[in-house]
C-alpha cells in the first residue's frame, strides 16, 4: 500500500490588530486580564494563576501586575497591538496595579472605564459584605 504524504498546511498569516480592549476582572481571589480586538474576539489573556501563583497569592496586586504585563506582551508580540481601551470589572485588590502595569508596558491607553456590576438591590450579600 502506498503511503499518503500529508502536505504541510500553510500557517495562518499574522493578523495585524492595532487597537483593542483590555478587560480586567479583579475579584478578591484572582485577577484575570483579557485582551480583545474591537469586535470582542479574544486575542490574549493571563491571570494570577497562569503566572504561577496558587491559592491566596493569586489575588495580590503583584500577581495582577504580572498578569497584565504578560497579557499585553502576548498581544503585542502576536498581533502588534499598540492602543487599548481598559475596561475594569470588580473590586479586587489587583485592579489599580493591573491598570498601572498596562500603562507601563508601552501600550497606549486611550480610556479607562469602570464597568463593575452593581445590583439594584438584588440578592442579600454575604456577612462580610454587609455594612
From Swiss-Prot:
PANTHER family named among the record's database cross-references: 40S RIBOSOMAL PROTEIN S14/30S RIBOSOMAL PROTEIN S11
Physiological role: Located on the platform of the 30S subunit, it bridges several disparate RNA helices of the 16S rRNA. Forms part of the Shine-Dalgarno cleft in the 70S ribosome.
UniProt KW keywords: Ribonucleoprotein, Ribosomal protein, RNA-binding, rRNA-binding
Key word Nucleotide-binding present: no
Gene Ontology cellular-component annotations: ribonucleoprotein complex; ribosome
GO MF, any single term: rRNA binding
SUPFAM superfamilies: Translational machinery components
Protein name: Small ribosomal subunit protein uS11
Family: Belongs to the universal ribosomal protein uS11 family.
Stored InterPro entries: Ribosomal_uS11, Ribosomal_uS11_bac-type, Ribosomal_uS11_CS, Ribosomal_uS11_sf
A GO biological process held by the record: translation
Subunit structure: Part of the 30S ribosomal subunit. Interacts with proteins S7 and S18. Binds to IF-3.
